[in-house]
């Protein structure tokens, strides 16, 4: 499952292959949550209206109603949060990166520091993510340009 709400759960329709890079985007326009895989619409669900607020983001962690066997076992290359819903065209155009000063970009973590326990936010808001309490990051290096594949 990609996410769940009081209105139900949403899963991807994509059969993910091992050792394959995917660009995953979730867009919430206030009434519909849409999942994009590699810039193409994959699935969507109705969601309740919301007020913009960042209460917390869980990636790869079991949440209410999920089993520990559903943990995310993979690698992340970057993560972005926006204050506005992006169009499919914008998602596709920004798969390989985005200008940190782009209108509506709240946070942009490239996750390419290579050492330490902090992901630095390149956006003007500077919401760095630091891991504490013995949590470590397993840094890996991959010089393959996924955007050219």
Regions found by a protein language model. Give the residues of each.
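Single conserved hydrophobic/aromatic residue that forms the stacking wall/gate
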Residues: 1-3
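Extracellular glycan-associated modules
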Residues: 5-91, 96-125, 136-149
């Amino acid at each position: 499952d990609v996410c769940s709400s009081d209105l139900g759960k949403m899963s991807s329709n994509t059969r993910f292959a091992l050792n394959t890079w995917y660009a995953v985007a979730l867009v919430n326009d206030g009434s519909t949550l849409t999942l994009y895989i590699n810039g193409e619409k994959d699935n969507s669900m109705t969601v309740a209206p919301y007020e913009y607020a960042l209460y917390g983001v869980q990636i790869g962690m079991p949440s209410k109603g999920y089993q520990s066997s559903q943990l995310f076992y993979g690698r992340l290359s970057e993560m972005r949060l926006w204050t506005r819903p992006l169009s499919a065209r914008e998602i596709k155009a920004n798969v390989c990166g985005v200008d940190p000063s782009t209108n509506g970009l709240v946070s942009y973590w490239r996750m390419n520091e290579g050492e330490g326990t902090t992901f630095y936010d390149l956006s003007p808001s500077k919401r760095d993510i630091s891991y504490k309490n013995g949590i470590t990051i397993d840094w890996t290096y991959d010089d393959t340009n996924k955007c050219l594949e």
